[in-house]
């Protein structure tokens, strides 16, 4: 990608009123994925009224604060290290504080958290007490645009496949590296088969 212009104004049209008109559709979904480009009141509406599992991407530290009031109503959260610090109130300096940040987030009622660690991979934890830290998968870096979105899409897909925490984290890492290997924003080689092969699921 050489240049991109993003007009975020469209998100302002995604009001609670608009979402209410689509409540039946939302509740019939297997999962609903949101990010913090949505207005805070719309995020709150989804947290209060959507019965489908909610997967949330904090997007940035400036916008992540919108999730603080609704953390306990989310199913899955995918913050990076800095966003996890902001939302948990725990400064992450080592493995112990990383685990503490994840546990603090889960204590809100959140079901799963996947903390992106950049070149250190990902740390994942769930309410059952399971925790796993995985390194990034090897790959040729061509373009990092869309890697985070690919990770979020993959962990949502993996949840719908019924995978465990470890394989879900593997799916996220696999999608990220597949996305990274193409000059296109969405790698044409991205597929369910490619994801399964790259992730090397344990089951």
Whereabouts are the PLM-identified features?
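Ribokinase/PfkB-type carbohydrate-kinase core domain
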Residues: 1-131, 191-194
């Amino acid at each position: 990608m050489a240049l991109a212009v993003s007009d975020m104004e469209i998100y302002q049209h995604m009001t609670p009123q608009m979402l209410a008109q689509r409540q039946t559709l939302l509740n019939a979904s297997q999962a609903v994925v949101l990010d913090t480009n949505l207005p805070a009141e719309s995020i709150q509406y989804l947290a209060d009224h959507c019965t489908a599992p909610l997967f949330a991407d904090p997007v940035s530290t400036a916008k992540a604060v919108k999730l603080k009031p609704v953390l306990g109503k989310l199913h899955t959260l995918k913050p990076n290290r800095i966003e996890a610090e902001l939302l948990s109130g725990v400064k992450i300096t080592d493995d112990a504080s990383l685990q503490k940040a994840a546990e603090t987030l889960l204590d809100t009622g959140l079901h799963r958290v996947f903390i992106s660690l950049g070149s250190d991979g990902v740390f994942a934890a769930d309410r059952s007490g399971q925790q796993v830290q995985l390194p990034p998968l090897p790959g040729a870096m061509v373009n990092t645009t869309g890697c985070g979105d690919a990770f979020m899409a993959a962990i949502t897909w993996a949840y719908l496949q019924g995978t465990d925490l470890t394989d879900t984290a593997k799916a996220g890492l696999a999608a990220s590296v597949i996305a990274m290997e193409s000059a296109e924003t969405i790698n044409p080689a991205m597929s369910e088969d490619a994801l399964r092969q790259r992730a090397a699921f344990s089951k």
